Structure formats: C-alpha cells, structure tokens
UniProtKB/Swiss-Prot annotation:
Function, in words: Catalyzes the decarboxylation of four acetate groups of uroporphyrinogen-III to yield coproporphyrinogen-III.
Record-listed E.C. numbers: 4.1.1.37
Gene of this entry: hemE
SUPFAM superfamilies documented for this protein: UROD/MetE-like (SSF51726)
Cellular component aspect of the GO annotation: cytosol
Pfam families: URO-D (PF01208)
Catalytic activity: uroporphyrinogen III + 4 H(+) = coproporphyrinogen III + 4 CO2
Predominant location: cytoplasm
Name by which UniProt lists this protein: Uroporphyrinogen decarboxylase
Length: 355
C-alpha cells in the first residue's frame, strides 16, 4: 500500500505530536458542492451514487480538490446495513430515508441475518478500494457505520422520527426483543467495519446520531454497551499502522467519561458542549473531534475565524489530540467559500499551539 503523505489526522487521533490541528467536515462530500449536485442529478438518486464505486469515489474526492482537508471520508450512508438486511430502503423527496418493511416484533428480528460485507455490502468495499487507489496516499480514508441504537431507530420507526415512540415502546414493553436486534446490529457493524478496514479504511467512526434521545440509564443499556462491543471487536492494526476508532453520540456531552471508557481512541463532540470542559474531563484518555456549530458557516468570514480561534484556545496548549470538525454535518445551502475559509483558518490559527 502507498505510504501516507499526510498522516496528521491519524496522529492527532492517537494523541501523537502534530504540526497543526487537522480538520475535516462531516458530510464534506455533499449537496453544498455544485459538483456533487451534478453527479447526483446524473446518477438519478442518492443510493445510485453509493452503489457505483466510481461515482462514490468521485464524490468522496471532490471536496479534496477544493480544500486542503486532512482526511477523506467514504461516501456512503449509515443505512446500508439495514438495507442489506432486506428492509427495503427508499428515499422520499423532502422526507428522508424510509423502509418498506420496518421491524415490528420478535419474528421480524428473528428473520434478519448479519449481512456478508463482501456480498450484500460488496459495493461499499469496492468503493473503499477504489477511493484508496485514487487517493494515492495523499490523506487517510475514514470508514464509518451507524451505531446499533441509531440503526434500530430507523428500522423500527420505518424512517426518521421526532418522538421515537415505536422504538421506545419496544424498549420498555419488550426490551429483550430490542436487545436481540441491537446484538445482531453490533455483530453486523463489527463485520462491516472490519471489512472496510481490510479494504483500505485507515480509521473508522461510529455515528450514534440518536443516542442523545435516551436517559442516562437507557443510553448505557441500549446504546453505549453495544458501541463498546463494537470497539472490542474491531481490527485495530492494519498495514503496519494503528486504526483509530472514533465514537460520536450527538447530544452525548453528559456521557463523555462513559464513552471514553469503551477503549475508543477519540470521542466526537457536538457544539452543545464546551471543548475546554470536554478536555478537562476526558482529554487524558482520548482524543477529541469537533466541535463548531455547522450553522456558524453561514456567518461572515471574520466571525467564522473568531469561532475557530475560540475553539482552538479552548482546547489549548499541548495541542495534540484534537481533530477539528463541525459538531454535525455541513448544511446543504452553505457557501463553499465559507467552508474553505473555515479549513484555512484552522490550519493557520492552530500552528502556534503545536510549537
């Protein structure tokens, strides 16, 4: 495999010395870029881009042509696993993802099997291999999956939800059924991420988008314990390097200590927690990723720069162990020039912290 020309992102995740704070953006390959919209229009729909290795590679690399990002992230969707389990994923305009056959009872859970990542999810592995080849060692490639809890919310609700009543009904009325599903999903995520690593992903991330809707007790029982199982089951060395693992629970700021105790290398932060506070609590154990509010990219350029400066100074001296990112995905109507200024500001303003 090609030697990495820029491994700053991987080194920061492992709390090794770096010359500046690395940066990438959640959803950096996406609708805010006109070149992405063009590919998507020609492909017909979102999953057609995901399932074509050349198109997935093209959109993964598009933001790297514009910006000096320190990592590429596989262009895919968190719902590939439930789709491969036969739930019938489809997208309604303006409605987001939906499933034709949601999970409603134990019989539904018994029917689904752990997908073979090189068979039903082979298109994802083909995309990983294609992207790695195309990157030519410029920057590392991040693989990812949804967390078992977050995948289960879509599978049981049948799509997005505001109140999560269907999954919470199962959680409180039939907890053993939900645990059975979450356990199958954890096994699926382990095999899926390990296949991505074998195909060339140099770091992996688990997105627990909906963990923050749970009480502390339920978060530990229904979300975190399954992410801990995943961390335990992952390949942590490949191609002569450590493969860092990042866990990200949106609205999970109150549980940082528990997340850090899973054995992950890094914890993702959203903007609802102060990075200085997060570092004081868990910075000795894990690296931190985040955490600018993505809506800050609507602000005038000097305001964006001011926010970057505030977050960098919040993380402070002894600057390794921080990967700069947004606290969630970049919004589709953001001006790409604002994203570019954000990235340039992180690189320029972070250098004094790494002398």
């Amino acid at each position: 495999m090609t030697e990495l020309k820029n491994d700053t992102y991987l080194r920061a995740l492992l709390k090794q010395p770096v010359d500046y704070t690395p940066v990438w953006m959640m959803r950096q390959a996406g609708r805010y870029l006109p070149e992405y919209r063009e590919v998507r229009k020609n492909a017909g729909d979102f999953m057609s881009v995901c399932k074509n290795a050349e198109l997935a590679c093209e959109v993964t690399i598009q933001p790297l042509r514009r910006f000096p990002l320190d990592a590429a992230i596989l262009f895919s969707d968190i719902l590939t696993i439930p789709d491969a389990m036969g739930l019938g994923l489809y997208f309604e305009t303006g409605e987001g993802p939906k499933f034709e056959r949601p999970i409603t009872c134990k019989a539904d859970v018994d029917k689904i099997a752990v997908p073979d990542p090189e068979d039903e999810l082979g298109y994802v592995m083909n995309a990983v291999r294609t992207i790695r080849k195309e990157l030519k060692g410029e920057v590392p490639l991040i693989g990812f999956s949804g967390s078992p809890w977050t995948l289960a919310t879509y599978m049981i609700e049948g799509g997005s939800s505001k109140a999560f009543t269907k999954i919470k009904k199962m959680m409180f009325a039939e907890p053993q059924t939900l645990h059975l599903l979450l356990d199958k999903l954890a096994d699926s995520v382990i095999s899926y991420l390990n296949a991505q690593i074998a195909a060339g992903a140099q770091s992996v991330m688990v997105f627990d988008t909906w963990g923050g809707v749970l009480s502390p007790r339920d978060y530990n029982e229904f979300s975190l314990q399954y992410m801990a199982k995943i961390v335990d089951g992952l390949t942590r060395h490949n191609e002569g390097r450590q493969v860092p693992v990042t866990l990200f629970t949106k609205n999970g700021g109150m549980w940082l200590e528990s997340i850090a105790a899973t054995g992950c290398d890094a914890v993702g932060l959203d903007w609802t927690i102060d990075i200085e506070n997060a570092k004081a609590r868990v910075g000795d154990k894990v690296a931190l990723q985040g955490n600018m509010d993505p809506s800050m990219l609507y602000a005038p350029l000097p305001r964006i720069e001011q926010e970057v400066s505030k977050i960098l100074s919040g993380f402070g001296e002894g600057g390794t162990g921080h990967v700069f990112n947004l606290g969630h995905g970049i919004h589709p109507d953001v001006n790409p020039d604002h994203a570019g200024h954000f990235i340039e500001s992180v690189h320029r303003l972070s250098k004094p912290y790494h002398k």
